[in-house]
């Protein structure tokens, strides 16, 4: 493996870590950084490049699982809930499952059709459409004078509604974080609470989707490229650790509009570059 391959793997892992959980669409950034600049498919072959992107996504997932390990242990029943979370209050595995259900079902039913509509223009329009949803979410949340709810206040009904918003992420470029955080704040959650629920829901659905993709493409896994895969995985893991912590600290202060404006600019850039 030459130096350039190490650099490409590290940069793509960096991009994955920066964008997978921020509401800005990792897909749109990968198009610009990889398809226009680094061209990993030319470097290692299209199938290996596809497998690599699955691997770096797993690095990001592992980072979030580590950050939320206490909550995950609680949901799995290995750690007791706080006393204040008794009598039906508190986030439960059932609520997470309800939130996962809509996107999981639609994803299984329409996976091939969603892949068939993947095109730079559809990604660009998804970025812009998602941006307007995020702006609307901040507007609605600001006008809601009721006390904003925390993640342990989420009801089954709210979990299902957020899960329905997550279905928008099946449109390539819309962003899972963008759609679900927007849904959460529209329903009266704080931005951080919506982000927490989003990241917790993302772990099982992304593990499932990545594992399924990896199994389907197992024959394409090139053992000689393990250092390439490992470099990207580690890069994505470490960057995701930092980005998610930073994002959760800031999101209640900066809200969604700054990300929305960035998405509009990125969407317009993609339309210009690929017009």
From Swiss-Prot:
GO terms for cellular component: plasma membrane. GO terms for molecular function: undecaprenyl-diphosphatase activity. Its EC number is 3.6.1.27. It is a multi-pass membrane protein. It catalyses: di-trans,octa-cis-undecaprenyl diphosphate + H2O = di-trans,octa-cis-undecaprenyl phosphate + phosphate + H(+). It is found in: Cell membrane. It is an enzyme of class 3 (hydrolase). The keyword Transmembrane applies. Keywords: Antibiotic resistance, Cell membrane, Cell shape, Cell wall biogenesis/degradation, Hydrolase, Membrane, Peptidoglycan synthesis, Transmembrane, Transmembrane helix. One of its GO terms (biological process) is peptidoglycan biosynthetic process. The chain crosses the membrane at residues 48-68, 90-110, 117-137, 154-174, 195-215, 223-243, 254-274. Its main location: membrane. Catalyzes the dephosphorylation of undecaprenyl diphosphate (UPP). Confers resistance to bacitracin. Belongs to the UppP family. Bacitracin is thought to be involved in the inhibition of peptidoglycan synthesis by sequestering undecaprenyl diphosphate, thereby reducing the pool of lipid carrier available. This is Undecaprenyl-diphosphatase 2. It comes from Shouchella clausii (strain KSM-K16). The gene is uppP2.
């Amino acid at each position: 493996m030459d130096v350039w391959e190490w650099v490409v793997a590290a940069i793509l892992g960096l991009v994955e870590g920066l964008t997978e959980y921020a509401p800005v669409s990792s897909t749109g950034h990968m198009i610009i950084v990889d398809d226009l600049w680094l061209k990993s498919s030319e470097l290692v072959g299209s199938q290996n490049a596809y497998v690599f992107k699955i691997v770096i996504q797993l690095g990001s997932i592992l980072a979030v699982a580590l950050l939320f390990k206490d909550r995950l242990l609680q949901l799995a029943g290995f750690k007791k809930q706080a006393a204040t979370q008794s009598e039906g209050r508190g986030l439960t595995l059932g609520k997470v499952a309800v939130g996962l259900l809509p996107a999981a079902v639609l994803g299984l039913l329409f996976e091939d059709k969603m892949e068939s509509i993947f095109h730079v223009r559809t990604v660009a329009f998804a970025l812009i459409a998602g941006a307007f949803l995020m702006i609307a979410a901040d507007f609605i949340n600001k006008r809601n004078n009721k006390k904003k709810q925390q993640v342990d206040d989420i009801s089954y009904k709210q979990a299902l509604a957020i899960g329905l918003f997550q279905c928008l992420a099946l449109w390539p470029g819309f962003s899972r974080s963008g759609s679900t955080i927007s849904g959460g704040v529209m329903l009266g959650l704080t931005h951080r609470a919506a982000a927490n629920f989003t990241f917790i829901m993302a772990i099982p659905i992304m593990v499932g989707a990545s594992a399924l993709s990896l199994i389907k493409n197992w024959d394409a896994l090139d053992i000689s490229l393990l250092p390439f895969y490992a470099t990207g995985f580690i890069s994505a893991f470490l960057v995701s650790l930092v980005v998610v912590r930073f994002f959760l600290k800031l999101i209640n202060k900066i809200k969604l509009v700054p990300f929305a404006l960035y998405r509009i600019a990125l969407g317009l850039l993609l339309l210009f570059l690929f017009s």
